């Protein structure tokens, strides 16, 4: 029986490249001349720290970062940015977390979405991924389109497509 896995992963090397590109653009931007502003990637806990002298500039830096991530093939929804920025002394910063894996509540939501669609496929949760099996390849492609089209707030990839 054909099957595939639904996962949510971010290529950390591409994130590192995007952060480097954003830092390079930051050096050439006229509106950031003489301003203390940085991007810092923490590989261990998969966060990106965006630091600047004002909250408005932090928003500008986040826009630059999102644009660079998008150019590298990483969707903006994979970046979880808190609403409140932290003010410390003369700097403002925010720790944006990269979404890795699918949380159990989201897994249940996806499984329910697939079951409610009346497609002839079965879905089961396996760790941080969801295995979807069906009798025909067309049903599986319908399930893929359903997950892509459902506004779930997180990017998903499809792996291990087997016939």
From Swiss-Prot:
NCBIfam families referenced in this protein's UniProt entry, alphabetically: PRK05412.1 (NF003819)
Keywords of this entry: Nucleotide-binding
Record protein name field: Nucleotide-binding protein Ent638_0893
Gene3D superfamilies assigned to the protein according to its UniProt record, in alphabetical order: 3.30.70.860, YajQ-like, domain 2
GO molecular function, one term: nucleotide binding
GO cellular component, as recorded: cytosol
CDD domains from the UniProt entry: YajQ_like
Family to which the UniProt record says this protein belongs: Belongs to the YajQ family.
InterPro entries xrefs: DUF520 (IPR007551), UPF0234-like_C (IPR035571), UPF0234_N (IPR035570), YajQ-like_sf (IPR036183)
Function of the molecule: Nucleotide-binding protein.
Pfam families referenced in this protein's UniProt entry, alphabetically: DUF520 (PF04461)
Upper lineage: Bacteria, Pseudomonadati, Pseudomonadota, Gammaproteobacteria, Enterobacterales
């Amino acid at each position: 029986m054909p099957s595939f896995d639904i996962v949510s992963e971010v290529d950390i090397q591409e994130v590192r490249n995007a952060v480097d590109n954003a830092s390079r653009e930051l050096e050439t931007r006229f509106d950031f001349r003489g301003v203390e502003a940085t991007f810092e990637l923490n590989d261990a806990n998969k966060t990106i720290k965006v630091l600047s002298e004002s909250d408005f500039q932090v928003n500008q830096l986040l826009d630059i970062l999102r644009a660079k991530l998008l150019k590298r093939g990483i969707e903006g929804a994979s970046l979880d940015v808190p609403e409140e920025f932290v003010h410390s002394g003369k700097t403002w910063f925010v720790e944006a977390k990269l979404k890795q894996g699918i949380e159990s509540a989201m897994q249940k939501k996806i499984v329910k979405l697939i079951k409610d669609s009346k497609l002839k496929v079965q879905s089961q949760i396996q760790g941080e991924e969801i295995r979807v099996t069906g009798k025909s390849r067309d049903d599986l492609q319908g399930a893929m389109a359903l997950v892509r089209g459902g506004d779930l707030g997180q990017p998903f990839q499809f792996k291990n497509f087997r016939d």
